[in-house]
Structure formats: structure tokens, C-alpha cells
Swiss-Prot record:
The gene is folE. It comes from Streptococcus sanguinis (strain SK36). SUPFAM superfamilies: Tetrahydrobiopterin biosynthesis enzymes-like (SSF55620). Its EC number is 3.5.4.16. This is GTP cyclohydrolase 1. GO terms for molecular function: GTP binding; GTP cyclohydrolase I activity; zinc ion binding. Pathway: Cofactor biosynthesis; 7,8-dihydroneopterin triphosphate biosynthesis; 7,8-dihydroneopterin triphosphate from GTP: step 1/1. It catalyses: GTP + H2O = 7,8-dihydroneopterin 3'-triphosphate + formate + H(+). Belongs to the GTP cyclohydrolase I family. InterPro entries: GTP-CH-I_C/QueF, GTP-CH-I_N, GTP_CycHdrlase_I, GTP_CycHdrlase_I_CS, GTP_CycHdrlase_I_dom. Keywords: GTP-binding, Hydrolase, Metal-binding, Nucleotide-binding, One-carbon metabolism, Zinc.
């Protein structure tokens, strides 16, 4: 990540909105924002494969559900945050991921400029591609600051997206069980 370019761009924005970049409260803002972007966009250098590659053999293929994985991301359209919870269900195919690896997979896809719809699909596809799951179902519920602070200005509006793959897309009973276990 080119922090010097970010700092220069932020300094230009400060000036363009009519503020004085030499004012005490703004003097270090370009550096603060560059450092913040390093954190917020840390997923740009990672892959879910590195987290899901280490898995554990199991003797049965009962569904695994991990709920309420908190995340935050940045809307790629307005560079404003969106945040919420991810619920993941998957049907293993002889192997399971460590539970922390599911949360890390969410982080990989959330920590980059993103849209919620793609985030949801990327998580589901990672479970299929890198874990070899028989099926995956991902439910993401989030609040978007671009809906809250600008435009329509509707605070508290929740957006829900889902992605189903494999047996959790084709087997209605299994899909319903997953939704029930997720609390939906």
C-alpha cells in the first residue's frame, strides 16, 4: 500500500473542501488516514485459501454453523463503512476448518473496498473451493453508512444478502435447517 500517495490525496481533499490543512486538528490527519487504511484494507494482501488450507479430518459430515461473526468493511462506491454480522453454515466433505478460520475468511473479504453482495458470494465460494465443502450457506446482515449519512439518509436500515452453494442450494430441507440454526 502506498501510504505516501494516500497522505497526499487526503491533504488535497482537506484543501479541496475548504479547510486549512495546517490547522492543529488536521495537521496529522493525512498520516492518520493512511495508517487507518492499512488496517481497514489489510485483506488486500491475503487469501482465504491460506486460512482454510489447514483443516481437520472428521468421521461424519454434519452441518457446521458459526453465527454472529461481526465484521466491518468499506463500501467501494462511497468509501464509507458498512458493518454487521455474518452467519455461515457448511456441510463438510470429510474435513472441517478451525472455527477461527471461518472468522478469518470473513475478514479477508471484508477488509478491502467491497460491496455486500460480493462479500457474501466470496465467503460461500471460498468454503466450496478451499475447504471442499459439500454445501455452503452465507447470510450477511449489515448497516451501510452510505445509506445512513448521505443520499436517502435512513439510519438503522439493514441489508440482508445470502449465497447458497452445493447441497445447501439444492436440498430445501437442509437449507431450511441451516436457516433455522442461524436463527432465521
Amino acid at each position: 500500500m502506498d501510504t505516501k500517495k494516500i497522505e497526499a490525496a487526503v491533504a488535497q481533499i482537506i484543501e479541496a473542501v475548504g479547510e486549512d490543512g495546517s490547522r492543529e486538528g488536521l495537521q496529522e490527519t493525512p498520516q492518520r488516514i493512511a495508517k487507518m487504511y492499512q488496517e481497514i484494507f489489510a485483506g488486500l494482501g491475503e487469501t482465504a485459501e491460506e486460512h482454510l488450507a489447514k483443516s481437520f479430518e472428521i468421521i461424519d459430515n454434519n452441518m457446521v454453523v458459526e453465527k454472529d461473526i461481526f465484521f466491518h468493511s468499506m463500501c467501494e462506491h462511497h468509501f464509507l463503512p458498512f458493518y454487521g454480522k455474518v452467519h455461515i453454515a457448511y456441510v463438510p466433505n470429510g474435513r472441517v476448518a478451525g472455527l477461527s478460520k471461518l472468522a478469518r475468511t470473513v475478514e479477508v473479504y471484508a477488509k478491502k473496498p467491497q460491496i455486500q453482495e460480493r462479500l457474501t458470494v466470496e465467503i460461500a465460494e471460498a468454503l466450496m473451493d478451499y475447504l471442499g465443502a459439500q454445501g455452503a450457506l452465507v447470510w450477511v446482515e449489515a448497516e451501510h453508512m452510505c445509506m445512513n449519512m448521505r443520499g436517502v439518509r435512513k439510519p438503522g436500515t439493514a441489508t440482508v444478502t445470502t449465497a447458497a452453494r452445493g447441497v445447501l442450494a439444492t436440498d430445501k430441507d437442509l437449507k431450511n435447517e441451516a436457516y433455522k440454526l442461524m436463527g432465521h
